[in-house]
Amino acid sequence: MFARPNTLLVFYRVSCPTCKLTLPYLHRVQMPVLGISQDDAEATEKFRQQFEVKIESVLDLAAEGYPASNEFGVHHVPTMFVLDEKGEIAERIEGFDKDALERLGACFAESERVPEFRPG
């Protein structure tokens, strides 16, 4: 469904605190990023504007049974998938995983300075 080569897929909900901290920075990753919102179009657009989310987003709706989330086995948000050149999953990052996010951070432009995440 969303198997785009060399892409970061990010499943999220607008009510997720970790998503609110993470998504505004993902446009800086040096690869295409596709957000997959589990909320309706209005809530998703409001979230994108409020938190200055600059990545493309598509909807994965409850009314349709969350087809993309089910296809990728997503049970928590945020869940991110790094897809390789064949469009296959190279890495899965679920929730807040500091080590995985640091590896993902290596994809940021050298000139970007992302603030350290300190939950709680």
PLM feature segments, named:
Residues 1-7, 21, 28-34, 42-45, ...:
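Non-globular targeting/processing and membrane-anchoring segments
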Residues 38, 60, 95:
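Active-site donor-binding loop signature of nucleotide-sugar glycosyltransferases
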